[in-house]
Amino acid sequence: MELKVTTLEGKEAGSVQLSDAIFGLEPRQDIIARCVQWQLNKRQAGTHKAKGRAEIWRTGKKMYKQKGTGGARHGSARVPQFRGGGRAFGPVVRSHATDLPKKVRALALKHALSAKAKDGDLLVIDKAALEAAKTKALLGHFSGLGLTNALIIDGAELNNGFAAAARNIPNMDVLPIQGINVYDILRRQKLVLTKAAIDALEARFK
C-alpha cells in the first residue's frame, strides 16, 4: 500500500510504502472490541467500597426478646434489612483488570491501523515539529490539512514545541510511538503518523 507524504504546511513530500501485514488487513471488529474492553477494564480505579454487616459500628446486643412481641425474630441490628445496617453483597475494593494475550493485543493494533487505512482516515506527514510552541500557528497547519479530530503519533521522542502547541487544542492528541494503542486510535476521527512512527511500527512487527 502506497500513501502520499505531506508536510505540516500541506506540501507534498514524496510517498511511503506501507506494509500490508500491518495496514492492509481486513478489520475484525471482534478482536478490536476485545482489546478496547481490556483497556477500559484495566483503567478502572476499583476503589468503590460499601460496609458489610461485619464492618458496621453498632451494638451486638439482641434487638428485642425472641418471643412475645408478635414481630419477626431478629438477633442483630447490623443486618442489611435495617436502616444503618451493612450492605448485602456491596462493592469492595478490587481490580477490574482482565487478561488478554499479547498476541491478541498486537493483532488488535494491526486491525485498528488497517481500519483507519481502509476508511481513508490515515494521513502520513514527514515530521511533527515546530520551531516555536505557538498554538495559533499549529491550528493553521491543522486547518490546512483538514484536521479537527485526530491522533498524531510521532517517533520515540516528541518535539517539545509541537507537543506544547498541541496540548491546548481540543480533540487533538499527540503521543510517542510507545503510547500507541487501540482505544486512542478509535476515539479520534483521523490517525496521523509521521515517517518515524511508521518506521518504528514496521520494526516492532517485523
UniProtKB/Swiss-Prot annotation:
The keyword Ribonucleoprotein belongs to this UniProt entry's keyword annotation: yes
Pfam families cross-referenced by the UniProt entry: Ribosomal_L4
GO molecular function: rRNA binding; structural constituent of ribosome
Biological-process GO terms, alphabetical: translation
GO cellular component assignments: ribonucleoprotein complex; ribosome
Keyword match DNA repair: no
Keywords: Ribonucleoprotein, Ribosomal protein, RNA-binding, rRNA-binding
Family annotation (InterPro entries): Ribosomal_uL4 (IPR002136), Ribosomal_uL4-like (IPR013005), Ribosomal_uL4_dom_sf (IPR023574)
Entry similarity comment: Belongs to the universal ribosomal protein uL4 family.
Summary of the function given for this chain in its UniProt record: One of the primary rRNA binding proteins, this protein initially binds near the 5'-end of the 23S rRNA. It is important during the early stages of 50S assembly. It makes multiple contacts with different domains of the 23S rRNA in the assembled 50S subunit and ribosome. Forms part of the polypeptide exit tunnel.
Quaternary organization: Part of the 50S ribosomal subunit.
Descriptive protein name: Large ribosomal subunit protein uL4
Source species: Bradyrhizobium diazoefficiens (strain JCM 10833 / BCRC 13528 / IAM 13628 / NBRC 14792 / USDA 110)
